Amino acid sequence: MVEGGGMKRVVLLGYLSVSLGLGRVVVGQEVVRVGEGSYAGGPPVGKMVDGKTKVDAVVETEGRRVYLVEDGGRAVPSNKWYQNLLLKQYGTGLWAMPHRVDATKEGIEIFYSTSYSGDGVRALTEFPLVVGGDEFRPVDSRVKGWGDWTVAFRSYESEGRWMDVTLGEGMPTVWCEFRGVVPRLWAGGHGGGGSRAERVPGWFGVDGKPVTLPVKGAALGMRHEGRCYGISAPEGTEFAIGADGRVAVTFAGEGGFLVISMLPAEKDFAVSHERAYAVPRDTRLEWEYDREAGQLRTEWVVETAPLKPGAKGVIQGFLPHQWRDNGERLELDGPEFGTIRGVMKCGAGERFRMSHPFRGVLPGLPAVGEMGGAAERVSGLLREHFAETKKPLGTDTYWGGKDLQRYAQAALVAAEAGDGSRGAIEARLKESLSDWLSYKPGEAARYFAWYPRRKGLVGFNAAYGSEHFTDTHFHQGYFVHAAAVLSQLDAGFASAYGEMAALVAKNYANWDRGDERFPRLRTFDVWRGHSYADGNGFPEGNNQESTGEAVNSWAALILLGEALGDEKMTAAGVMGYVFESRAAEEYWFDPHGDVFPAAYEHEACGMIWSGSIVWGTWFTASPSWIYGIQWVPSGPQLSFFGREPGLVERVYGGYEREQEAFEVKETARRKEYRRQPVTTAALGGELASYHLGFRMHGDAAKVVKELETLWNEPGDKVAHNEWMASVHWQAAALKTLGRVDWRCHGTSPVSMVYGHPETGVRTMVAWNPGAAARTVKFFEGKKEIGELSVPPRSMASGRVR
């Protein structure tokens, strides 16, 4: 596929232009075979044309300009914190933390955020330090290169005049390197955007003491509107106030650079200055999943180049999801910065090591103990809504993907329950998933297509912006999950379609540096610990709403990796799951009370942006969905919410208070609004499945009782709803199992230990999707507490000895 990529690109772009020129709709694309699966070698033209603008969204995505210094055919990132930089003339919203950088027609504006909006939802970007040049008028900003959490771009005027800028997430520093430009520095006005400050900045030396310009040397500090910056330069540099009020920078030799550091205070300049002269040229996150220890070990590597002889190491900051639960020695004795993601603690160096526990994930739960009436209820739901229904499955990648995972869950429940509906459900799942994972020329929907310019697989029909890679991990995680489960249930599916399913997984989570077909970790921000949803980015950065679906995409990777025997895929899934689940807790729910700004009046948020938090969603202001979208889809992968004792109950109590207040407010605001009770029944079937699916990780017995009550109510449309089949089963299983015992782990990533809070009984559970029996050992710390022999293609459970 890699060798043929150039030929496919030439053919496709030619046929795109001809098709558009003639105004025809072309649906034929070549078939690219992968095992028994396949995909279309090019995206469909004419399928997604806006009725008003007549713009074809697919052609626009493939054909839009990407701002690069050199386009060597490398896979172009999408969904990144710097995405706007790749796709706009002047990239903005580059939140490196604790600062934001905007490229402008004058150079760059550096906003050092030190406070929040009055309601606590935004990190304020005010009074920037501006880096430009004498008569410097860049025509655009162009990406020069990127690492796992760094990006370099060129503020470009001509081949002989430019400024290269390097940014790194968590690096409170901006590196500027000049060619043919005499630098100028000045203080911007309140909102930046080319405005000038009304007040004159103050200046200080590397020792933090005031100085008066002109100054000659290697360091100058600037204090403006409560913000302190350290400016490091080559020896012999002169800083002087010019006739226009800007600071003229004159280097003693050819070329030159300026390094701008954010400082908590003047006294911190010396520390930053010492580390300013090593510019990061690449960053890499390396990881190892230790099955025996139940640990994820990561190494954060910063490759630097010296701007002066002997310089090495950078100041690197880390956020709460990284340092709070870290088991390695990590010296974070440098400056600290308050951010909208909590305290960023800094250390200095080129390599930083961490270790975090991973206690397993399961695709479902086994039949344990007395399942009560749940088995009978589930049997009826499986028969009515899955085995005997003629209702078609979704035709776009979001709803089609969700349906596939629901069917996979239903098939798994049927297998565990020994229910007679298994065969019919499994057959329908296989038929539909196989259809999605293969392409037939001329078909209108349910296939994947290759974007040769942007390098990625997009499913059609697309939905919610997925044609430009928005929500890619949400959608495609469902397919990967379904493929993993079906690989267990159907002995031939993995050999036939496993390679194609793995290709879909790589599209959103490419973990292999050697596989250049896709950008690395397309949707994941390794430093922030969570994914970003938008493929194009915005002027304010990027965002993510549904943490539940993001976590699900990583759980799916673990499951498919185990089903295919691909340890690298599994390890990547563990890495993503460990960090995304921690980030979901920390930054959407603030369980420790030290992340949300003090003025923020809610206990959770529905969405986060690069520099802000949002009480809301893209589609509603109702708390039922602000909370609920974080719990989509229900399943064992959400068990991480139980890591913090009492968090599930505390969070749900917060939801109920918010929903009650919302109902009161809407009733007063809108005459036509009918106030709804804050009950499970009022949520409807699908949404209720997410709420109950979350609550069962806190008090499964209570959820089971509520389901029984709803089931017995005449005309019930919630407990009888198709979305509830797996919730009935899993809640009943958890009623017997209890909650995850976070002290314990198994030697398989698809195993867990549960402990019942009342009986004290602990139970080991393990999944084996393979063709041979597996033995899984279980440990509490380093003490072995039992083992399970798991038959092929099954799930097993047993009591801890």
Regions found by a protein language model. Name each.
Residues E499-Y508, M569-E580, A584:
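Short secondary-structure subsegments characteristic of cysteine-rich extracellular domains
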Residues T547-E580:
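Active-site neighborhood of glycoside hydrolase catalytic domains
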